[in-house]
Amino acid sequence: MNARTVYNAVSMNFSTTVRLLLALASGVALALAYPSFNIPLLGWIAPALLIVAVLGARRRFAFLLGWLQGAAYYSLTVPWFYTVMRQYGLLPVIQAGAVFALVIVATSLFHAAFAAVIASVGKFAPERACLAVPFVWVSMEFAMAHLPAIG
């Protein structure tokens, strides 16, 4: 059994709803891998769920799936951001919530770009997408860490 057989058997048969649920589950699982919840095994499972959801999807839909994964992840891992805006930024409830939402929207774009790249690479050769995943993920993390310092 080669990668193409697995790809055809698994990825091509998922409905839109299943793909959306996989992306959401991926974001929740990734959040659960971090110290607040401390289930480190999910750190390996979460990206795999997103990859399975993205392979075989169109690039725009893959972008949405990645964004959904990022939004779920950041919503669960940085809720303290809202508190900081309220207590130290002295923002009213609605404005602090809006800033929190904007942060989630912006940071989730990196996950969306990751998913779109993997969908593009995997369109004709899923095995290449699987090989590209670590490089694209590390590139995404590097960009997230250094983007504010680039300008």
Place the predicted regions along the sequence by residue:
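Membrane-embedded alpha-helical bundles of multi-pass enzymes
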Residues: 6-151
